[in-house]
Amino acid sequence: MKGALMYQQLTDPLGSIWLSALLAFLPIFCFLLCLLVFKLKGYQAGFITVIVASVVAFYAYGMPFSLIGASFVQGFAQGMWPIAWIIIAAIFLYKLSVKSGSFEVIKESVMTITPDHRIQVILIGFCFGSFLEGAIGFGGPVAITAALLVGLGLKPLHAAGLCLIANTAPVAFGAVGIPIIAMSNLVGVEQYEISAMVGRMLVPLSLSVPFFIVFLMDGVKGVKETFPAVLVAALSFTITQFISSNYLGAELPDIVSAVVSLACTTIFLKFWSPKNIFRLDDLKDFSHHTQLEFGKVFKAWLPFILLIVCIIVWTQPWFKAFFDKGAVFDYTKVALSFNNIEGSIVDSAGKALSLNMDINLIALQAGTAILVAALLTIFFLRIKSNIVEEALGDTLKEMAMPCITIGLVVAFAFIAKNSGMSTTLGTAFATTGDAFSFFSPVIGWIGVFLTGSDTSANLLFGPLQQAAATSLAVPEALFLAANSVGGVVGKMISPQSIAIACAAVGLVGKESDLFKFTLKYSVGFIILIGIWTCIIAFLMPGIIPEVIAK
């Protein structure tokens, strides 16, 4: 039932779409100013941005204060569950590995494959990170891989920044294809067409990201020295991603591509190694890194093997069925409800937006899968209770402020979405006519920056992209895919992602440094993707699949 209080979103509160867009951009500008100029901590910048967004929503958009408050609570809760929950569980698992001594063996095992930091970043940040993105998403891959790379000797800022950049190519198919499947259901277009177009558009990005990572670490010299290994990783990933996205759908491209790339690169490194070993730490002697016993290596990697097993189980339909309505574990669901104002917000088309959310404690929650992996690790490795208590205490202490930052950032995203500010920004770009082919991925980029999620950006702007395609007589699949592809390079500058990465590597309070590191690359990538979209639209329309309505 709709509440007595009603608010219909405004797309153009000032009577000029571009002036309204400038106003809607004000909270984002404020956030950038806080981080880049005033160098405030993440939670401080997030708090100020929420205040500015609330003022704009109340005075310019006319959104009632009670609905602004409900949007804040909804967003903050979403930030805590599942996002912060995933990060806390992931860091706890990592700390168990470190404090139990397993991580030292993991480092040794990676060193036996290659002691070269450039290739280690490709194996862990790009390949393993892509697998985790395909399985869990929500920032977990960056948290886990960045922490692993710091343990292997990379500086925290390097590890966090490089993992954020590596976590671009797989984002569109993250969390078992949810970004594309969700958009498909919303706009009424078969997911296979969108998945295929995304796979085709991602080819240049997926192929170039591993080389770009090495270039950032060691320049042109590094690319030349590691070229064979990086080519194997990039080609095997890109080809598999292209084939799987075009023939298998949206669910498996990340997982399959990551496994194939990791296997191909590891096997290749058995027969080839770079002439010069590159390290970002002071380690010079690699002679003591001899072959380790299989049992010892297996035991050390067991926490992450259990992580993979638990994630696979958690994604299975038969497992999820236990938590369906009326099933045996249905009681684990908790609803965050605003019954008195539910249905009070409607978009410009008159469709009601939900202010309620179901907090599913077990099913569909990757954080719970990671926690179960941690508990199984404690059992199988027989980790002493004092070590467990120390790991848990350190995790909760270190994650407290980052979790607040994440909550504030997602709260801002919900205020912007529910008030109509996000739609204002997208609508302004949609007025650019033929130039929209360039701005289509930019809208997705802005959407992911605002929400921290490619799924949210696709749900937010998918209908707008579809409408623009229809009005410009462009195949819908192109702009729908461009929204998702543009979004993947917005992930590295999303305040949510920045907060997660900083928390994982111990850079809490240094969010501005990491943001400056990734911003210029994100802008460069989105410009290139915009140009690539124009090339497809005007010169290569034949590669766009024919859209089939659902």
What do these predicted regions represent?
Residues 140-148, 164, 177-188, 215-216, ...:
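Re-entrant/interfacial helical elements at transmembrane boundaries that shape
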Residues 23-33, 40-62, 84-90, 230, ...:
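Hydrophobic mid-bilayer segments of alpha-helices in multi-pass membrane transport proteins
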Residues 98-102, 115-116, 149-158, 185-192, ...:
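Juxtamembrane helix-boundary/capping and inter-helix hinge elements in multi-pass membrane proteins
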Residues 284, 288-443:
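Transmembrane helical segments that form the transport core of multi-pass membrane transport proteins
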Residues 69-152, 161, 382-468:
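Membrane-embedded alpha-helical segments and adjacent helix-loop junctions characteristic
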Residues 12-26, 79-83, 136-141, 192-207, ...:
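Structural signature of hydrophobic alpha-helical transmembrane segments
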Residues 172-283, 485-550:
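Juxtamembrane and boundary regions of transmembrane helices in multi-pass small-molecule transporters
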Residues 118-130, 156-169, 190-210, 407-408, ...:
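Alpha-helical transmembrane segments of multi-pass membrane proteins
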